C-alpha cells in the first residue's frame, strides 16, 4: 500500500503540473500567444508522458495488488489480464450497443464461480466526429460487460434493453451479421414501458422471458445505476451495465486505502449477484 501511495503522489504532482500549465497557457494565449501557446503544449506533453509512463505503472500496480487479490479470493480464476479486454470485433458483432469509431476494453477476467463459467471486461465505445473546426465525442457505452452460458438452450438472437431517449434502432437485417429481428410486446405493461425487446424468434422470447424472468430483469435494473442491457447470442447471455464508470481504475486524487478494496469487491460481487438473480447457479450450490 505504501508503494502504491508513493507512486500515486508522483502521478498526482505531475498531473497537477500538467493541468496548471494547460490552464495558464490557455488563459495567456488570449493576450500573449507567444508565451501561452508553448505553455499549453508543454502541459499537453507532460500529461501524455505521465499517462504513458508512471501513470500507467501506477494503474498496473494497483490492479496487481488490489484487483487481483479480490478476484482470486472470490473466483476460480483462469485469466485476469488488466491490459487486455474484449476484442472490438467481438463487441461490434453482437449489435447489443451502437457501434462507434473509438473503442477500448480492459480488465479481462475469465473464470468460474461454483462451476459456472464467465468472462468479464470493461468496455468503452464512443463515436468521434469533426467538421474541421470542432470535434464532437458521443459516448455510446461505458461500463462492465459480462458473459455467461445460458441454462436454457436458446440458439436465436435476442436483445433486452432498458429504454432511453434515442436508445438505438432494431438490430439485425440485410447489412448485419445477425438475423432480422422483430420487436416483442408482452402482457406486462410496466415491463413494456421500461424495456424494449427484439428477437429473431418470438417463440424463444416468450419461452425465456416469462413473468418470473421479467421480475428478475427488473431486479437487475434496480441493482445498478445506469442502463441495463441483456443480450443473447450463440447460447450465451451478455449482461451489460452502462454506468459511465470503471470501478477497476484507481484515482490519483485520493490516497489508496481499504476503501479501494471495498470498491473493487463490490464490483466483483455484482457478477455473483447477476448469477444469483438469473438463476445460473445450481440449486445445490446456492
Task: List PLM regions with ranges.
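Generic signal for short, ordered secondary-structure residues
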Residues: 37, 49-50, 176, 250
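Transmembrane alpha-helices and immediately adjacent membrane-cytoplasm interface residues
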Residues: 39-64
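Charged, low-complexity intrinsically disordered regions
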Residues: 68, 72-77, 81-286
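Canonical alpha-helical transmembrane segments of integral membrane proteins
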Residues: 9-31
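Hydrophobic alpha-helical transmembrane segments
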Residues: 26-44
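Cytosolic juxtamembrane N-terminal segments of multi-pass membrane proteins
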Residues: 1-10
